[in-house]
Design a protein with these regions (language model features):
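Short beta-strand/loop motif that positions the catalytic acidic residue
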Residues: 328, 334-336
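Acidic catalytic loop of the alpha/beta-hydrolase fold
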Residues: 339-343, 375-376
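C-terminal catalytic histidine-bearing segment of alpha/beta-hydrolase fold enzymes
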Residues: 347-350, 359-435
Length: 435
């Protein structure tokens, strides 16, 4: 009788690499229980699925759908993205520091036999270096790829949760980009709130990044999600000469107020961004139709996008607050979700795409709109089950929308799209620099 075993192709690899998991040695038609457990920042996350072995006594997770379990349908990485925290409400997906790999233990059981294997997900490839940045008034972390370079660069900004987006920076560096994760609030030495953030701070970040890494082809892209998606479009339009490309995850087409990340003394209808010391006009300002009621009222979890949609009915306020994306002087990528619970990123992205088409934007414009997905588009092969959360600044219990399976698809497809987009953008910049 064959011994039960689990094999994992590419058991130790970057987090964005799909693994091929197979179980062999079961009896034909036998039920096989498979579990996946991963400690994440001290909290155990777990998923499980029950399969029926084929005529050869094997289970192939890419080929076979579970008959029950944490996910449905054939999906080679389903046991990772369908994980939930055990006896915890944690939403922390990564270890601290993020350079510590995520180690998943796989266990298969038939009732009479057991097998175990593991897979390791790295955010930082071998040779990637990490450097904390606390200079020129900037707060962030710089990740550099292995090798001497020069490398094209990306500056990453977070959304309304604030802080330093080290996981995304580490993965960008692992894929060949000098990646600077720049905090602008809720980080050491910075305000705990998003209100009254000067755009000149980010210009200083762009200048520091160029001076420090001397990027290949002078290429510096911006990458941001949510409020950071709004921000990178705004920065691309404001400091156009300094921005080589823009990647906006679930972005806005408009300048918004402080919202959930506001300073309570300023209020959620107060300004977020300053330029030259003056607040930028935001969509809630003197808006005749905007109402917080659809977000505030009713039971938890709340959907912030319902309030955001009320502001779109005032055409004059919309026009005043629109980000002038036509001023961007490089390629633009937009990633949105049709069931975004935080704000209507699909509607916003279409507005941006349509404006760029209207002015015949001379650079590459890509828009990936993910059906049934929610606000939390990250990168491949992380859990997508925690849809409801308390906002990290306001504490308001909300839903980001979507569902685990479609959010997992968006995670995987978006990252491949972004890597291909940036590769084209770097090549275009390099070609333009040729004599």
């Amino acid at each position: 009788m064959a011994q039960l075993s689990i094999t994992v192709d590419q058991a130790d690899a970057l987090i964005d690499v799909a693994r091929h998991i197979r179980i062999e040695g079961a009896q034909p038609g036998e039920a096989v229980e498979v579990t996946a457990e991963t400690p994440r920042s001290g909290v155990l996350w777990r998923a499980q699925a029950r399969f029926i072995a084929d005529a050869k006594g094997t289970v192939d997770l890419r080929r076979d759908a579970p008959v029950s379990g944490s996910y449905a349908g054939a999906d080679g990485m389903g046991l990772v993205w369908s994980q939930s925290p055990v006896a915890s409400t944690s939403r922390e997906l990564f270890n601290q520091p993020v350079t510590d790999a995520l180690l998943t233990t796989l266990q298969a059981s038939t009732g009479t036999a057991q097998a175990q294997a593991s897979l390791s997900q790295q955010l930082a490839a071998p040779g990637v270096t990490r450097r904390e940045v606390r200079e020129d008034g900037l707060v962030g972390t710089l990740y550099l790829p292995a090798g001497a370079g020069p490398h094209p660069a990306v500056m990453i900004v977070n959304g309304s949760g604030g802080g330093i987006n080290e996981p995304r920076a580490a993965l960008y560096a692992s894929r060949g980009y000098a990646a600077f994760a720049l905090a602008y609030f809720k980080a050491p030495g910075l305000s705990p709130y998003i209100s009254n953030t000067p755009l000149e701070y980010f210009e200083k970040g762009l200048q520091w990044l160029r001076r420090t890494v001397q990027p290949a082809h002078d290429f510096v892209a911006l990458s941001g999600q949510s409020r950071g998606g709004e921000l990178v479009l705004l920065l691309g339009a404001t400091f156009a000469q300094q921005v080589s490309a823009v990647v906006g995850y679930v972005p806005s087409a408009f300048v918004h107020s402080g919202q959930n990340a506001c300073d309570p003394q300023v209020g959620r209808e107060g300004p977020t961004w300053l330029l030259g010391g003056k607040p930028l006009t935001h969509i809630w300002e003197n808006n005749r139709t905007a109402s917080w009621a659809p977000f505030d009222e009713g039971p938890s979890p709340h959907r912030h996008e319902r309030a955001m949609r009320t502001a779109l009915r005032d055409a004059e306020a919309v026009a005043r607050a629109r980000i002038p994306v036509e001023r961007i002087q490089g390629p633009v990528m937009l990633l949105s979700a049709t069931d975004d619970g935080s704000w209507p990123s699909s509607v916003y992205s279409q507005m941006v795409r349509d404006k760029l088409a209207e002015v015949q934007h001379p650079h590459d414009v890509q828009w990936l709109d993910f059906e049934r997905a929610g606000h939390a588009i990250l990168f491949p092969y992380v859990p997508t089950t925690q849809l409801v959360y308390a906002h990290p600044v306001s504490g308001k219990v909300s839903t980001g929308g979507g569902n685990p399976a479609d959010n997992a698809h968006a995670d995987a497809a978006s990252w491949q799209g972004v890597l291909q987009f940036l590769e084209r953008a770097v090549a275009a910049k390099a070609g333009a620099a040729q004599p």
